[in-house]
């Protein structure tokens, strides 16, 4: 068997990626989230496949087909709630994974980092088109509001929006194409994840110390396969608790009302996962400015390798940048909270302050703290 896994053309790839892969001996549980994201993706593809067997992407029957899945299909309610809450768990793991990358300086592996940003954007797009499918009030109005943002693009905006809608409003054509996108995108994510892994294995994993770990590597199996399995077990436990005890905790009650183009909900809040980006969008009064800020809030992650001037790798022994990092995380949580609040006096102001802080911390404060720490080292 040992010879087979090292010589067989297919098994050799698996062997180099998951069995004999040289891995730093000191990577902590923060490194588990990559495998957890893989597990989430598999759960989403499997539950999604079973949902797609019973779902109909037609405006007249979409809402009732989801109700039919929950009421009449064997364990349909479980599959539906695992899929909906699985998406939330996916994003929680994704945010922690990116946060770990920033904290430990994993952005130094620029190819892996950039593919990661593309994966992040693709996942957000998948979640958005998926949110439209149940065809409830929030699905319909969320689709209308978010697709309408493209009309802010000069000259081609209005044409582009109508092209995406397939008509003059969000209707049957929109729902059908969104279902098609929602079906194909997870497979594109899976392919991109393989490219992400390919680039990672070219350089090897980073580690908490930020030092070169070539002198102290251990095989991935059995050490990290067991560690990853424990992480996956805990993830499944959390997902089951969420899906069985609090299935609607992260959803919106408005989505239990069928879509009605004549009745607008009191306030349109996106899915909990994209709330921070939505808060940044809303904090700018100008439409085009808001759209640009929304896109930049994600793309700004690509500046981390460029703006990093520190002589040390990661934040493990950098107290100034560590403090700024945790302020940044707190700021992100504030933005997430604001994204789900109505557009009223205290919330709009808090949102604007938090949005300015978000960009200021990344573009100004972090590079500044790098310079300060470099000068302290010289003393």
UniProtKB/Swiss-Prot annotation:
<feature type="binding site" description="axial binding residue">
    <location>
        <position position="182"/>
    </location>
    <ligand>
        <name>heme b b562</name>
    </ligand>
</feature>
<dbReference type="InterPro" id="IPR048259">
    <property type="entry name" value="Cytochrome_b_N_euk/bac"/>
</dbReference>
<keyword id="KW-0999">Mitochondrion inner membrane</keyword>
<comment type="similarity">
    <text>Belongs to the cytochrome b family.</text>
</comment>
<keyword id="KW-0812">Transmembrane</keyword>
<feature type="transmembrane region" description="Helical">
    <location>
        <begin position="226"/>
        <end position="246"/>
    </location>
</feature>
<dbReference type="InterPro" id="IPR048260">
    <property type="entry name" value="Cytochrome_b_C_euk/bac"/>
</dbReference>
<keyword id="KW-0472">Membrane</keyword>
<feature type="transmembrane region" description="Helical">
    <location>
        <begin position="347"/>
        <end position="367"/>
    </location>
</feature>
<dbReference type="GO" id="GO:0045275">
    <property type="term" value="C:respiratory chain complex III"/>
</dbReference>
<keyword id="KW-0249">Electron transport</keyword>
<feature type="transmembrane region" description="Helical">
    <location>
        <begin position="320"/>
        <end position="340"/>
    </location>
</feature>
<keyword id="KW-0349">Heme</keyword>
<dbReference type="InterPro" id="IPR027387">
    <property type="entry name" value="Cytb/b6-like_sf"/>
</dbReference>
<dbReference type="GO" id="GO:0006122">
    <property type="term" value="P:mitochondrial electron transport, ubiquinol to cytochrome c"/>
</dbReference>
<dbReference type="Pfam" id="PF00033">
    <property type="entry name" value="Cytochrome_B"/>
</dbReference>
<dbReference type="InterPro" id="IPR005797">
    <property type="entry name" value="Cyt_b/b6_N"/>
</dbReference>
<protein>
    <recommendedName>
        <fullName>Cytochrome b</fullName>
    </recommendedName>
</protein>
<dbReference type="GO" id="GO:0008121">
    <property type="term" value="F:ubiquinol-cytochrome-c reductase activity"/>
</dbReference>
<keyword id="KW-0408">Iron</keyword>
<comment type="subunit">
    <text>The cytochrome bc1 complex contains 11 subunits: 3 respiratory subunits (MT-CYB, CYC1 and UQCRFS1), 2 core proteins (UQCRC1 and UQCRC2) and 6 low-molecular weight proteins (UQCRH/QCR6, UQCRB/QCR7, UQCRQ/QCR8, UQCR10/QCR9, UQCR11/QCR10 and a cleavage product of UQCRFS1). This cytochrome bc1 complex then forms a dimer.</text>
</comment>
<feature type="binding site">
    <location>
        <position position="201"/>
    </location>
    <ligand>
        <name>a ubiquinone</name>
    </ligand>
</feature>
<comment type="function">
    <text>Component of the ubiquinol-cytochrome c reductase complex (complex III or cytochrome b-c1 complex) that is part of the mitochondrial respiratory chain. The b-c1 complex mediates electron transfer from ubiquinol to cytochrome c. Contributes to the generation of a proton gradient across the mitochondrial membrane that is then used for ATP synthesis.</text>
</comment>
<dbReference type="InterPro" id="IPR016174">
    <property type="entry name" value="Di-haem_cyt_TM"/>
</dbReference>
<keyword id="KW-0830">Ubiquinone</keyword>
<keyword id="KW-0496">Mitochondrion</keyword>
<keyword id="KW-0479">Metal-binding</keyword>
<feature type="transmembrane region" description="Helical">
    <location>
        <begin position="113"/>
        <end position="133"/>
    </location>
</feature>
<feature type="binding site" description="axial binding residue">
    <location>
        <position position="97"/>
    </location>
    <ligand>
        <name>heme b b566</name>
    </ligand>
</feature>
<dbReference type="Pfam" id="PF00032">
    <property type="entry name" value="Cytochrom_B_C"/>
</dbReference>
<keyword id="KW-1133">Transmembrane helix</keyword>
<keyword id="KW-0679">Respiratory chain</keyword>
<feature type="binding site" description="axial binding residue">
    <location>
        <position position="83"/>
    </location>
    <ligand>
        <name>heme b b562</name>
    </ligand>
</feature>
<dbReference type="GO" id="GO:0005743">
    <property type="term" value="C:mitochondrial inner membrane"/>
</dbReference>
<dbReference type="InterPro" id="IPR030689">
    <property type="entry name" value="Cytochrome_b"/>
</dbReference>
<keyword id="KW-0813">Transport</keyword>
<feature type="binding site" description="axial binding residue">
    <location>
        <position position="196"/>
    </location>
    <ligand>
        <name>heme b b566</name>
    </ligand>
</feature>
<feature type="transmembrane region" description="Helical">
    <location>
        <begin position="178"/>
        <end position="198"/>
    </location>
</feature>
<feature type="transmembrane region" description="Helical">
    <location>
        <begin position="288"/>
        <end position="308"/>
    </location>
</feature>
<feature type="transmembrane region" description="Helical">
    <location>
        <begin position="33"/>
        <end position="53"/>
    </location>
</feature>
<dbReference type="InterPro" id="IPR005798">
    <property type="entry name" value="Cyt_b/b6_C"/>
</dbReference>
<dbReference type="GO" id="GO:0046872">
    <property type="term" value="F:metal ion binding"/>
</dbReference>
């Amino acid at each position: 068997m040992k010879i087979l896994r090292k010589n067989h053309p297919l098994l050799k790839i698996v062997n180099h990626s998951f069995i004999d892969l040289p891995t730093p001996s000191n990577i902590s549980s923060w490194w588990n989230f990559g495998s957890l994201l893989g597990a989430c993706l598999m759960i989403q593809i499997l539950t999604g496949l079973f949902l797609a067997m019973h779902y109909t992407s037609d405006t007249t029957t979409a809402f009732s087909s989801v109700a039919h899945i929950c009421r009449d299909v064997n364990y349909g309610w479980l599959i539906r709630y695992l899929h909906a809450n699985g998406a939330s768990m996916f994003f929680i793991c994704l945010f922690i994974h990116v946060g770990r990358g920033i904290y430990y300086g994993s952005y130094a592996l620029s190819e892996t980092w950039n593919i990661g940003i593309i994966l992040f954007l693709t996942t957000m797009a998948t979640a958005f088109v998926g949110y439209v499918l149940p065809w409830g009030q929030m699905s319909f109005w969320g689709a209308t509001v978010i697709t309408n943002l493209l009309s802010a693009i000069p000259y081609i905006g209005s044409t582009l929006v109508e092209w995406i809608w397939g008509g003059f409003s969000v209707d049957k054509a929109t729902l059908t194409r969104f279902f098609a996108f929602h079906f194909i995108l997870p497979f594109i994510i899976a392919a991109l994840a393989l490219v992400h892994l390919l680039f990672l294995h070219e350089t090897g994993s980073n580690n908490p110390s930020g030092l070169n770990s070539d002198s102290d590597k251990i095989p991935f199996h059995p050490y990290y396969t067991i560690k990853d399995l424990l992480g996956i077990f805990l993830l499944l436990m959390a997902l089951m608790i969420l899906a069985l005890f609090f299935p609607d905790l992260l959803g919106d009650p408005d989505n239990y009302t069928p879509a009605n183009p004549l009745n607008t909900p009191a306030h349109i809040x996106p899915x909990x996962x994209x709330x921070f980006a939505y808060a940044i969008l809303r904090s700018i009064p100008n439409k085009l400015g808001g759209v640009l800020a929304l896109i930049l809030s994600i793309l700004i992650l690509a500046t981390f390798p460029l703006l990093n001037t520190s002589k040390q790798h990661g934040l493990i022994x950098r107290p100034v940048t560590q403090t700024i990092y945790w302020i940044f995380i707190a700021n992100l949580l504030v933005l997430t909270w604001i994204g789900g609040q109505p557009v009223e006096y205290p919330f709009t102001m808090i949102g604007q302050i938090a949005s300015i802080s978000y960009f200021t911390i990344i573009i100004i404060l972090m590079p500044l703290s790098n310079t300060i720490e470099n000068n302290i080292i010289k003393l």
